[in-house]
Amino acid sequence: MNREEALHIFEHSEEIVSADAVNASIVRMADAIRADIGDAFPLVLSVMGGAAVFTGMLLPHLDFPLEFDYIHLTRYRNTTQGSPDMHWRVAPRESVKDRVVLVLDDILDEGETMAAIRDRILDMGAKRFMSAVLCEKTLAKAKPLHPDFCGFTVPDRYVFGCGMDAKGYWRNLPTIRALTANI
């Protein structure tokens, strides 16, 4: 990993969602979440590290009482291809029993990660599981679930920015970009 590799990735990408569109989407999602579970005192779980940026943008707009925690699991490990192995690094530390749980993630790609989270949260006794993602990728194959709240639908390309990375780089971008070449 080095600066030149990061710049090479950026040079072989294009912006597909502007920063203004991202911000407007965050406000829209917050309004929908508030209308649905604003009175439920939900437990909000952020999936680290991809959801860090999305979570930081969304939480200030959720102007109702909630509890916050994070979980950490991965399928990608700084590559552009998902692995079938789910690796849990941090499970929920707050009790989910009899709670409405809202899980925040950067992107719902094939849906395997969110489905694994859903299954574990429900097995732990949650009353209701919900998910919010900044992006859902359009795929030809069926997914095990779709998010309850979604900012954007993106094409079946490798996307990054707003918390999503390309080989570990560019999570910090305020826009969403897509690779234009297979690198």
Describe the residue ranges of each PLM region.
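PRPP-associated nucleotide enzymes
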Residues: 1-183
